[in-house]
Amino acid sequence: MSGHSKWATIKHKKGETDAKRGKLFSKLSRAITVAAREGGTDVNMNIALANAVEKAKSESMPKDNIERAIQRGGGGADGVSYESILYEGYGPAGVAIIVDVLTDNKNRSAADIRNIFSNHGGQLAQPGAVAWVFERRGSVVVDGEKYSEDDVMAAAIDAGADDVVQDGEEFRVLTQPADFVAVREALTAAGIEFGQAELTMIPKSSVKLEENDARKTMKIIDALEDSDDVQEVYANFDIPDDILERLAG
């Protein structure tokens, strides 16, 4: 699991405030609505919508909220046009960062992202500056205490998964983006329940951080994730688990 994924998992386990959960659900709802508007409301025919819905489910977003977001997308334009933009930059100690934004005002978003980088010891970069550090992959997390590696491997690899990696008490099934839905469906058909399932950006290499730089990096990551227009933040840091636990505490 990447350092950023570990950070997100630790924060999720420790719980978030109602305000933060509300903001997260608002972002997830926006992503679902835009996906439904652009590709239709049938999750079986709209991969982007299926991914957005799976992401919402993995974050325990209520079913009614998800259905309302889909209905809004299917109801036509509501006067608001959203644009998806990727920003790239560097955090403290040279950590590569990609920020996935969904916004109705790109000038506002650009200024906000630039200020966050500047105020937290980072630097916004030109498009392409850090994108090469990451690769787009599908990721499905399975509870390793409930299922054996052989069972997960058999279902996933036969459906086109690239690999099944053990990470602590979990198995992480990795796929190419085009195979993500098929692998997810194969796991379900095999009776294997899974947690987080998403298309994500996985770093090809990582920057190892000690506590001082780790603290600075977590501050810029948290600030970016707290921005209203930011959907996802990807970073290539590698921080020891004990330090992550202390910082999350």
Which role fits each region the language model picked out?
Residues M1-I116, G121-A125, V130-S139, K208, ...:
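N-terminal cationic and glycine-rich segments that engage phosphates or anionic surfaces
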Residues S139-G249:
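Positively charged, low-complexity, intrinsically disordered RNA-binding extensions
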